[in-house]
């Protein structure tokens, strides 16, 4: 059973298209796993309603930022905003703010 659907915004798709084949496959596999089971190692909350998908592959730490859209009662969406290859222990505040701005713009455009 899937807990949510994932919708990729253009920047998230661009990021995924730049990732080499097997790493991209692992990212997509982990995202599919996160949809079907609640695992904070795969999908973790940050702040201000921003979450991120986590994948480690051959020493690289891939992150795809996302937020929840529960406006439709029939379908819970997770909107993937953009991604980074993590180089430090914590996600940069600027990346969280970027995801928050994308989230705000997304909901403003739905009004």
Model-derived features with residue positions:
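Basic, Lys/Arg-enriched alpha-helical interface segments
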Residues: 1-61, 70-78, 85-111
